[in-house]
Structures are given as C-alpha cells and as structure tokens.
Curated annotation (Swiss-Prot):
One of its GO terms (biological process) is tRNA wobble uridine modification. Residues 17-140 form the Rhodanese domain. Monomer. Involved in the post-transcriptional modification of the uridine at the wobble position (U34) of tRNA(Lys), tRNA(Glu) and tRNA(Gln). Catalyzes the conversion of 2-thiouridine (S2U-RNA) to 2-selenouridine (Se2U-RNA). Acts in a two-step process involving geranylation of 2-thiouridine (S2U) to S-geranyl-2-thiouridine (geS2U) and subsequent selenation of the latter derivative to 2-selenouridine (Se2U) in the tRNA chain. NCBIfam families: PRK11784.1-1 (NF008749), PRK11784.1-2 (NF008750), PRK11784.1-3 (NF008751), tRNA_sel_U_synt (TIGR03167). It comes from Serratia proteamaculans (strain 568). GO terms for molecular function: transferase activity, transferring alkyl or aryl (other than methyl) groups; tRNA 2-selenouridine synthase activity. InterPro entries: P-loop_NTPase, Rhodanese-like_dom, Rhodanese-like_dom_sf, SelU. This is tRNA 2-selenouridine synthase.
Length: 372
C-alpha cells in the first residue's frame, strides 16, 4: 500500500460493520479490554502506564505538556517498533482504518507517522466512541421490530430452532453461554460491551439481509455474565411466545447429547484425552455446584454421587447413559418446575404450543403473516 492510493477518513459506520472491514485500535490495552469490536486488533500508541502518565500530566499541566510527554515516552527505538507493527498491519489490511477513542490526537499522530513512512492510511472519524454509539443506536432501532419468543422446558431444542430460522437471533451464541448453570462453553465469555457490540452487528447484518422480525429464545435478562441490552429485553417482555412441548424422553436425549456427549468431545479435542477429561469432569461438577443452594444440600449430595458414578462408568466404558441417573431428577425436580413457574407468568402471551416440528412450521407461517 502506498501514499499514491489515498483513501478518505471513514465515517460510514454501517458499511464498516456490514463488511467486517478491519480496524486498528491504537488505544491503550486497558481501553481495548473494556470494550472493542470483533473486526479490530489492538496495536496501541501508548501502553497502559504511558497512557496513565500522559493523562496525569494533562490534568496537572494541560494539553501541550501532555502531548510533549507523550512524544518523549514514545520516541526513538520504541516509536520505530510500534510504527513497524502498524505498517505490517496496514500491509495485511489495505482496506482498514485506524481509530482511537474519539478520533483525535492519538489516531492523528499514528496516521502522521505512517504517512512519514510512506503509507497513507485513513482513520475513523469520531473514533471508538462514534462506532460504539452507532451500535447502541442499532440495538435500540432493532428492538423496535416485531419479535416472537420460543419457549419450552430445558432440552426442548429452543436454541436449535432459533438457528434453523433465517430471522432467528441466537442470544446465547452471541454471549458464548447457554444460559443454565451448565451453560459455559469452551469459548470464554467476553465483557458486557463486547457482547452488546457483537449482538448489534449480528442484528445489523440480519436486517441488511432482509429480516423484518426477530425470533428469539425466551431468556432471562442475564446470560452467564452478560446482561441483555435493556431495549431488547424490555421488548421481549411484551412479545408473543410459541412453546415447544416435546416428550420428556426426547428432551433428555437432547441434553445427554449436548451437555454430556458433545462436551466431552469438545474438551478432549481442545485439551487432549487426559486433560480434556479432567476439564470435562470439572465442568459437570461445577454446573451442579452452582445450583447447590437451590437444590438443597441433601439433593445436591445425592445428584453429585450419581454424577461421579456416571463419570466413572463413562470413562471405563465410553457409554454416557448412566448420566441419566442425575439428569432425570435434575429435570423433574429443578429445571421443569422452575420453567413451569416462569411460563405461567407469560400465559397470556402464548400464541402456540406443539412439538419441535409443529412450532417450527408455525413460526415459518407466523413470520409470513405477522412479520411485517
């Protein structure tokens, strides 16, 4: 990339997110960790300590002194190293943009140093703050579209159905968590801001693809450590609900496949047989431990004993059927009564009940009749 092909600074935020245009975030690492975008990489102008020193100088001595300190801190060999990293990223991402917090001094300075090295690279007008505000507005506007929720007991396949439908929005997928005490995945949950940004981009892309209504899983406000954005959650509290009523045996088989068989495979693929089994064992024990108070001490201890026997049998034989000895009472005495109570409060909003296939057919028809 050379200075002869110069692009203007960018403020078409919609295009940036729709096309996953790469972004170089020159904020300090602590700022990036607090919230950023999936299409961004952090190559900071200043590290956290340097940023703190410049910020203190700004408060005590003003802008000019702070700028001078920044230049003295990032100078000589350090400036060369960081410029080399930016140049390498610019070459890898010739269609990208630079941004800092507000599109001000930091991104302007990086832009200037790149230009001195022979590379013209545009920055985002308004910086991170403008991009973030665009996504917050997207969330608010998206929440105004019609919604329908998929309800049903644990194991009903609600998330599966959401992902089958073109206008389905997988909130749990965006949160990297499946909602229950056993809901964590091998992908760590990100912070609240990253979750909101990821969800906003997902909604933006679906609207761009023609979605005019959302199908969502009937969720609580909290998914793992992430909270649903209030505009979305508040609209969900008014949305009609289609309930999957699958037989207990069907739900049990789904849970055994998803939380037992599949998770063992995923842990062992990620960590190898020995460590993977250990982490799989810890994952199941942690899931039970997290709800021990709601289960009561006696039931928790009994289910833990069943779990440990099931793990021993599974490790020895490769057969996971023994896990039903604790999954069945967990459903019957904990998850099913809890969801029944929650669903009763939404009874006036239930528009359809049926098995998985019937709810799927209903939602496809309902989309045509009520999605505009």
């Amino acid at each position: 990339m050379s200075a002869t092909r110069e692009r203007e600074d960018g403020q078409d935020y919609r295009r940036i997110f729709l096309q996953d245009i790469p972004l170089i975030d020159v904020r300090a690492p602590v700022e990036f960790q607090q919230g950023a975008f999936a299409n961004a990489v952090n190559l900071p102008l200043m590290n956290d300590d340097e940023r703190q020193a410049v910020g203190t100088c700004y408060k005590q001595q003003g802008q000019q002194a702070a700028i001078a300190l920044g230049h003295s801190l990032v100078n000589g060999r350090l400036r060369e190293q960081r410029t080399a990293a930016w140049l390498a990223q610019c070459a890898q991402w010739p269609e990208g943009y630079i941004y800092c917090f507000r599109g001000g001094l930091r991104s302007q300075l990086v832009q200037q140093w790149l230009r001195e090295a022979g590379v013209a690279y545009p920055r985002i007008t308004g910086g991170y703050k403008a991009l973030r505000n665009f996504l917050l507005t997207t969330l608010e506007q998206s929440a105004e579209l019609p919604m329908v929720l998929i309800g049903g007991n644990t194991g009903s396949g609600k998330t599966l159905l959401v992902n089958e439908l073109a206008d389905g929005v997988d909130l749990e997928g965006a949160a990297h968590h499946r909602g229950s005490s056993f809901g964590r995945t091998l992908v760590s949950q990100s912070g609240q801001i990253d979750f909101e940004n990821r969800l906003a981009v997902l909604l933006l892309k679906k609207q761009h693809g023609g979605c005019r209504r959302w199908v969502l899983e009937d969720e609580g406000r909290i998914i793992g450590s992430n909270n649903l954005p209030l505009p979305v959650f508040n609209r969900m509290q008014q949305a009609p609900v289609a309930v999957i009523d699958d037989p207990f045996e069907v739900r049990l088989a789904r849970l055994q496949h998803e939380y037992i068989d599949r998770m063992r495979i995923e842990f062992e693929q990620a960590y190898g047989a020995q460590l993977g089994w250990q982490k799989y064992d810890e994952y199941l024990h942690h899931g039970l431990f997290a709800i021990r108070r709601r289960l009561g001490l006696e039931r928790f201890q009994l289910l833990t004993q069943h779990l440990e026997r099931a793990l021993q049998y599974q490790q020895a034989s490769g057969n996971s059927d023994e896990h039903q000895q604790w999954l069945v009472p967990l459903l019957q005495h904990y998850y099913d009564p809890m969801y029944h109570y929650q669903l009763e409060k939404k009874s006036q909003r239930i528009v359809f009940r049926g098995n998985y296939a019937e709810v799927r057919e209903f939602l496809m028809t309902y989309s045509q009749n009520n999605g505009e």
